[in-house]
Design a protein with these regions (language model features):
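Active-site rim/loop-helix segments in enzyme catalytic domains that contact anionic ligands
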Residues: 1-96, 220, 229-233
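Metal-dependent de-N-acetylase/amidase catalytic core
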Residues: 2-7, 83-234
């Protein structure tokens, strides 16, 4: 199993694309191996089916150039801190040995998103403990850093990543989720089918404007960032 440089976790397929699809495309262009892990099958989604979501997720991953997409089967609306979930997530981390991990920020209107971030953070810690036994019985692995992306929230980020050249890929990856973002005659009314992609574009535009770029994605970190570049640009 080839190790990943970046592994991004989401509660549901489309979470990662909403929060950091542009960043994924950017790092893939740089030669990084990037993976996505969907914790649930989104079986309680108002629109679409488990089968259609899987096909849409596959298409979105191809648009972004993702190396692998992992599907866990934790319960939708049941992402709580428990041994089984921790062992499954820690097993994924140990199997793919990423340098960086991303997960949803805890402040979000959907409880599953915040719970997913907490679960992944706890599992990442456990994955580094040699005596902790995960679901796949893999050796311990310690990640370098963990960062949090935003899904529904629009919070003050700790840092942003310029995605001006990758914004079209991000939007294309979201359009792959026709069942979620495109209103049809049979759609259940949700915030996602009422201009949600336009909201995402506006948010990334606002983050970009703060750093004189067309578009940027915002991230939260619990640790200080070490700046290697000269602040004076030398």
């Amino acid at each position: 199993m080839k190790r990943l440089d970046i592994l991004a976790f989401g509660a549901h397929s489309d979470d990662v694309e909403i929060g950091m699809g542009g960043t994924i495309a950017k790092y893939v262009k740089k030669g990084a191996r990037v993976g996505i892990c969907d914790l649930t099958q989104a079986e309680l989604s108002s629109n679409g089916t488990v089968e259609s979501r899987k096909e849409e997720a596959k298409a979105a991953a191809a648009i972004l150039g993702v190396s692998t997409r992992i599907q866990l089967t934790l319960p939708d609306r049941g992402l709580y801190l428990n041994d089984e979930a921790m062992k499954d997530i820690a097993g994924v981390i140990r199997t793919y040995k990423p340098k960086l991990i991303f997960a949803p920020h805890h402040q979000d209107r959907h409880p599953d998103h915040g719970h997913a971030g907490t679960l992944v953070e706890e599992a990442a810690f456990s994955a580094g403990i040699h005596k902790f036994e995960d679901s796949y019985k893999q050796p311990a692995h310690k990640i370098s850093e963990m960062y949090y992306y935003m899904i529904n929230g629009h919070h003050r980020p700790d840092f942003v990543i310029d995605i001006s050249e990758e914004m079209h890929q991000k939007i294309d990856s979201l359009h792959a989720y026709q069942s979620q973002f495109v209103k049809s005659a049979h759609s259940v009314e949700t915030p996602l089918v009422n201009g949600y992609i336009d909201y995402v574009k506006t948010r990334e535009s606002m983050y970009g404007r703060e750093v004189n770029k067309a578009y940027a994605e915002g991230f939260i970190t619990k640790k200080p960032l070490l700046i290697d570049d000269d602040l004076l640009g030398g």
